[in-house]
Amino acid sequence: MQFHVQETMSKGIKAKIDENLDVSALFKDRSDVISHGPLHVSLQVTGNEGSITVEGELTIDWELACSRCLDPVKLHTVIPVSDQFKPASEKDGEETEEDEDDDVIAVTGDRLDLKPYVEEVLQLFMPFAPLCSKDCKGLCQNCGQNLNEQKCGCSTERIDPRMAVLKDLFKDEQ
């Protein structure tokens, strides 16, 4: 997934990337990712005059822990990709207004490696708080019972900790 920047732009090269990428290293220290398949990369790379356009999609099947009850959640995620890459200007190492364009990714050097870019896009689109269902009740804060399976016998009365002293005061008067 590497391209020569100048050659791709000057010759107007069009290339199709259709491969599976092993992303195990990205998730090895993450306890919320139970399992995952390979990342399927399907991209069209087009060299234009002065830029390289990358369009397509990333697809992954993974199993994540529900953020409320910790049950496994199987997800099929399709991530649309559409970005433009341009060579960075080399004027004393300072960025010009042209380089500060938010829609363009600056490339330093003559090689464009799309693997780090694809991995970053995957991490940015990873679900922040996956849920097994919209109405997931989560775990009991006192005993840890999964409230989706059954109710626990814990008290649901909540007392503001700042007022707990007053509660004890009224008990003594009775």
Give the positions of each predicted feature.
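Structured interface patches
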Residues: 1-174
